[in-house]
Amino acid sequence: MITKQTIFSCAELADSIRTFLTADTLLLDIETSGLSAARHFIYCIGCSYLSPDKSDSITVQLFFAEKQEQEAELLAALTTLLQTHKRIITFNGNSFDLPFLKKRYEINHIKQPFSDTQSVDLYREACHLKNLIQL
């Protein structure tokens, strides 16, 4: 498994962003080898969060599986992050990312870490605006 981490300094991080990007918030996206969680696997998990020791910095972390056998390592890395991040923000995550993740945890015989997490799906939040922004 390849792990890449970059920390961005954001001293000008707007107060409006800080209202939803709190210390316990994890921005999450996954990349998969296909659309079926039963037949395909996760090869990349991307996460962003406020850096623990620097409130004016954002950490971006990517976990990349070079082969399917490394998927369990990706899931374990996400589990570790979710120990300190209890709110997940995704785009269409309630319909795709989270169900896919839950199935892959099950297939890999790893306990799912989502029981204590709150999910915010930006796609669902913005759906009522789709006519306004011509989606």
Roles of regions detected by a PLM:
Residues S51-P52, E69:
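Short, charged/polar surface micro-motifs in flexible loops or helix N-caps
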Residues A14-R18, L35, L78-T79, N108-H109:
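Short, flexible, glycine/charge-rich loop motifs used to bind or transfer phosphoryl groups or to couple energy/partner
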Residues M1-D24:
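N-terminal accessory regions of nucleic-acid-interacting proteins
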Residues S57-Q134:
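Conserved DEDDh/DEDDy metal-dependent 3′-5′ exonuclease domain
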Residues D24-S33:
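Two-metal-ion RNase H-like nuclease active-site motif
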Residues T32, S36-S51, V60:
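RNase H-like nuclease fold core
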